[in-house]
Structure formats: structure tokens, C-alpha cells
Amino acid sequence: MSSNTTTPTPTSTPTPTSSPSIGPVPIPYESASFGNLLFFAISLVLCGVVVLIGMKQYISLKRTPIYATFFSFLGWFMCFSIAYLVPLDIIVTDHLQCVIENNETLTGECEIPVTYLPYGMITQQWRFLYFGSLILCWVIFPVLQSFSTAGDFRFWERVKRATKENVILYTFMFIAGLIGIIVILSVKEMDPSSFLSFVMLLANVYGVILITITMGYGLIDVPRNLLRKGSHYAILRNYRVEAVVLKTELEDVKRQLIDHLKLIKTISDRAGQYDPFRIYLDVIISKCPTEYDVLIQEYHAEPLPAGMEAEILSYKYLVGIHSTLLDLVDRNHSAEVLYERLLGKAFAIEDIIETRERNKQTAGNNQIAGEERSIQWSFKSTKSNGKFEYLWHMYIHPWYFIIAGLVCVCLSGIILWSEIVLALVSNPDYSPFYRAIVRMEPGIGLQIFCFIPMIYMCVCSYSTLFKLRISNYYRLVPQQSNTFSIMFSANYLCRLAAPLAYNFIQICHVNQDNSIVSPFSKIMGDMNAFGDNALGKRFTLFFPIFMIVVCVISFFNLHKRLAGSCCIRSLRIVTDTSEGAVDHGLKILKQEREERSLTGGVAPVKTRMSIVKEMFTKKKGAGILVTDNSQLDGASGAHREPSIDSSNRYKPTPTKTSINIPKLSRTYTSAAGNVYSSTQDGDENSNSGIKPINSFFSSILGEKGNASNNNNNNNNNNNNNNSNNKNSNNNNNSILTSNYESYSTPRTKDKQGLLSSALDKMDFSFQDDDDHTFDDIEMGAYGTGRKNKK
């Protein structure tokens, strides 16, 4: 394919083969030099840096679990690695074809490119990408996604539930696949090799369908969004429409969250303090947002109708409550973040437009125009280089996006033309990519030429996945995406990588006239497992036509109109872009501006460059409300959550009782709210404290008589009544210990005598190693039925 190669003779040129093997032409052995390895290492590092920057746009590295960050990084890395693997694949194939056609060695006239990597190394890279993606997509990501959404309270319970769900899913898939294989084998005979190729074909077909939809939509959407950003008025109109949608969504999810918190409060009230499932309820309550505590604490559920019993708590029921709570909290947080970001961007655009209109009015006065060459921001301070900021937003910014949009329009047109040639024309000379590759020398120039359209196709395909929202199931939120959405995106990015590379190699016609097969085709195959029939020959050419259909649908917004006419709300597509929706959005933004002006403003939106800068400088600030209007961007009113006692959340306020116990070593508050304090004011006060403590314990322990409570002054009688019990081996030192002597308490049914024998000493203290003593007494757990501690 090189221009400096000689024309091969018919006898020396082997017949092209569609087999994934190399064929009769042997590939010369190549060893990787130091320069090859250095270039390969640089490529890996650059790809990793790009992946980290891209992930930082959508996730918070502090909030996201380590396992999700690690495996998501692997998935993103594999999908972005095709941006440098595909150009290298084309260079290797072109160079080896030159060597074979000229019957030369690797050091002959076919000059080795600077960025050249050995054929075997590229093959191993494709093998790693293919089988690595296979394991991630079908084993690791499904289990981790189920694990992240499980509502169980124990680690191993979550692992068990995630594994069980995936085993059930794969069992049904295996049964369906087995039935399909039986049907296919009954229709067509296949040898083991053909059957394996057929299975790989089916796996690739799913990815090809995904890539036609995502890239077909992105080829139209990316240039359209760039051109739209070239007009401030078009951006503001779009923000007003989005304000209506996000405002409605935020109100809906808040209402659902409050209803669910009320349900949790009702369950907590009816369960009581000593329910066996109290520990799980406390875990659920600890994850409830604190900003709704005042509202929920005052809520009291209506009593159940007569004859109707409350639902019995179970572990499975609490798991469902927990899972729903986590989902609603995440959706509420995402809706708040998106709405706040929209307000920040909308207010900034309004300030820019106001500055533009003011400049038009003062255009005749050069002195005033020169003095006002800065943007008057409503909720952030003007930067030190205000003049450059003014020039950027007024002049550079619109033209930058217009030029970028026009360039993307040209790239989209070239790619679509190449897809049409691939589908409808047998002569590859009509493909601009094929003609360029034929005429260019294999080297850095060819690699750059292949890299630009390849990275653009990646942007078009992946941006569609980033913008996609599947009901409440999947959504990427800038720097606030949950664990499930991050792994879902990595899962499908892996699925898109191989089909995207295959499509680019197809439109470049790399294997058209070559006597060798590219490293990619050697690993992935050429998808001709259907045989030589009409379907098999044209199967790989069907998806370009389907991609063109998707582009037409996206260009005329037919999908939005269809969703609006069918009332498919689950698709979450903004269908109302009429003037009525724009006016409604204008009212919302105006109302929010007035309210935020009084309450402290809106945090400025973090740009992509500021996020990247934070990664290296570790400086925080943009996007955070500050208390001083002179700091950062001028937004004030930082919200500080009040300190709340988490132990009493969503619980009725207990009636506290103050009980005096003479010579107590410290003041003790039980879980039931009773306060036990010491009185050190003399014997009179000490003796006066015996009656309330005796009467309290008598009521707790169920003693019906009051005679023993009135005998506190007659200690000798109490001692005589208990003299036969002092020889017992059971010790009460786990509750009360004497400062002067240790004594034994009997394990008897006479609970009043047990307490009196301790109180008669009048000199005792609580042990610090058992803080639940009085809780047990209040519950009636002490005495019979409880083992004494040694």
C-alpha cells in the first residue's frame, strides 16, 4: 500500500484470505527494541492520564469505593486504548505488506516507522483488550453492580445477594442460548471451528448494534451542540427549558424521599427501643439526610384502624427499605447538584448577555465603552484579568465553538460518506480514508491521520453514553456519579471498544488488498461465520446503513417526537421546547435569582479545566459557597448542618426521670433516659434519696407491696431477713460494689430483699465496666433468668 513499493507479480502475490490466520505468508520475527518499548510505555502513560482526567469529570475519588474506581479505570482504559492501537495496527499492517511485496528484510527500502511496534506485541494488546473486556463485562461488572445496589447490612450478605442475582440471570441466558444453538445446528451443519467463530460473531453483533446507535447519534449531536454554544441566546433558551425539567424532577424526588423517611419514622416508632431488629433500624436511620430531621421528628403516623395489625418486621423487609432509601438519597443528591449547576450556568449566561446588551447601548461613547470592558457577575467576583475574561466571553468563545462545530461537521460528513461507500460501493477508491492510507508512507504522519478520525469517533460514541439516562437506573452526574452508574458506563464502554475499532478498520479497507491479516482481524476474526451465502457476504455491511438511518432520526429529532407522542416518560427526553416552556423556565430562573440574592447566591460551576487544575494543584474553591463575599467567587451563605444526636433520631422523646442515689461514684444516664445522680449533702439528704430509688425499683420489678419501701430506717430488720442469703456463692458485684467490703447476694425470687441488702450499705458505686446495669433492671432482666457474672 506504500507509494514507493514495486508492483508485485501475479506469481509472487499470495491470494488474499478471509481467514483470521496469517495464511501462507510468514511474518518475519521481530524483536522489540528499546525505542519501541519506550514509545509503548509513553502511550500507556498518556492513555492512563487521559482516562484519569475523564473519570474525574464524573466521579468523586473520595466518595467512590476503591473497588469501583479500580475496575472502572480498567474499563475506561481499555476503551480509550483503541485510539492509539488502531493507528498502530494500520501502520504495522501497511509496513509488513510493503516488506512482503518487495521480498525484503525489515531493514530494506521499507523504512521502519518511528512509532512502529512488532506485530506480536500489537496482537497481544488486542488479545488483552478482547478477553479482558469479556471478563469485565460478563463476570466482574455485573456482580459489582448488584453488590453496589444491595441493601443488606453485612458484607457477606451483599456478596451473596449479588452472586445469587447474577447466577439466576445467567441461568436463564444459558437456557435461552442453548435453545438457540440447538435450533441453529438443526438448520445448518457446522464444524467446531465454524461454531466458535459463530459464537464470537454473535458476541460482536451486540456491540456492533450498540456502536451504530451511539455513534450515529453522536455524529449529529456533537456538531450541533458545538454550534449551539456559539450563540449565547441559544444557550440561554436551552437552559430555560432544562430549568423546567430539573425543577420538576427535584420536587418529585424530594417528595418521594420525604414520604419514605416518614415510613421509616413510622416503622421506628412502632418497633420500639428493644425490638430485635432495632440495630438494623438504627443503621437505616443513620443514613437518612439530616436536613429533614426537624420535619420528620414532628411527624406522627395515624393509628392503625381497629382490627388491623402492623406489618411484622423482617430482615428482608428492612433490606428493601434500606435499598430504597439509598436510591432515593442518591437521586435527590444528583437532582440537587444538576439543578445548582444549571442555575450557576444560567445566571452566568444572563450576566454575559446583559453585558453584551449594555455594550450595544454604549457603543457610541468610546470612553464609557472602554471603562466597562468587564463582565458584571451577579454571584461571583471578576477575576484579576477581567479584560481577557471579557474578550473571551464576548468574542473568542462564540467563534471558538463555531469553528470547532464546523470542523466536526466536516469530520462527520467524511465518516458518513465512508460508511456509505462501505455499504453500497464495491470500489474502495471512493473512500477518503482508503485513498489517504494508500498514498501516505507508514510513519508518524499516517498515525496522526488515523488518530484524528479515530478519536473523533470515540468522542461521538462515548459522549452519547455519557449523556444517556435510563430512567432512574443509570445516569452520570458531573463529579457526583454513584457507584452503579460509574461501573455501568465502564461496562458498556468496554463493549463499544472492539466494534468501534472494527468499524474504523472496515471503512479504511485495511484488509482489502493485503496478503496478510491485520493483528486486529487475527484476534477478532472477520465476522463471516455465516458462510458464503448472501447473508454472510453482506452481514458486515448492514450496520453502516443502519447507522445512516440513526443519523437521519437524530438530525430531525424524530426520537423526541415519537417519545412525546407516545408519552414514554421513562425515556426522560425533553420534548417540550415550545415558547411556553421557555417562558416557564424564565419565571423559574427569575424567582431563583431573587431568592438566591437574599440567601447567599449560587456556587459557581466548576469548568473542566478547573477540575483538571485541582488534580495537580490540590486547590479547592470553585463550586463551593463561602461565607465572605470577598472570597473566591463571592457566593456566600455556606450551609452548616446542625449537630444532631444520632442516637435519638426518628425516636419519640423519652420522659426523663431524675433519681438520686447516695454516694454514687458518677452521674449515670441510662438508655431509657433516666438520670441517676449522687447526693453528698449529708445523711439527711442521703436517707431521703432511699425512698425514691426504692419506690422506683419496686415499680420496675413488679413488687405490689409498699411495706418494704417504708422500712428504710430499720436496717436491722432487713439484715435479719437476708442473713440466710449472705452465704450464697452468687455475687452481685457486677452491679453494685462496696467501698469497704465485698458481699454476696443471693439468687432468689425476693427481688426487694436483693435491692434492700445493697441499699443498706449506703456506700456503693457503679462499676465502669458494665454501663447497661440499670437498663437491665428497668427491663426486668435482672434477677431470675439472668446469669450472674463472676
From Swiss-Prot:
It is found in: Membrane. The keyword Transmembrane applies. Residues 236-266 form a coiled coil. GO terms for cellular component: cell periphery; filamentous actin; membrane; plasma membrane; ruffle. InterPro entries: GPCR-associated_LMBR1, LMBR1-like_membr_prot. Residues 766-778 have a biased composition (Acidic residues). Residues 1-22, 630-665, 701-751, 765-790 are annotated as: Disordered. Residues 1-21, 706-734 have a biased composition (Low complexity). The chain crosses the membrane at residues 34-54, 66-86, 128-148, 167-187, 195-215, 401-421, 442-462, 539-559. Residues 644-665, 735-746 have a biased composition (Polar residues). One of its GO terms (biological process) is chemotaxis. It is a multi-pass membrane protein. Keywords: Coiled coil, Membrane, Transmembrane, Transmembrane helix. Belongs to the LIMR family. This is LMBR1 domain-containing protein 2 homolog B.
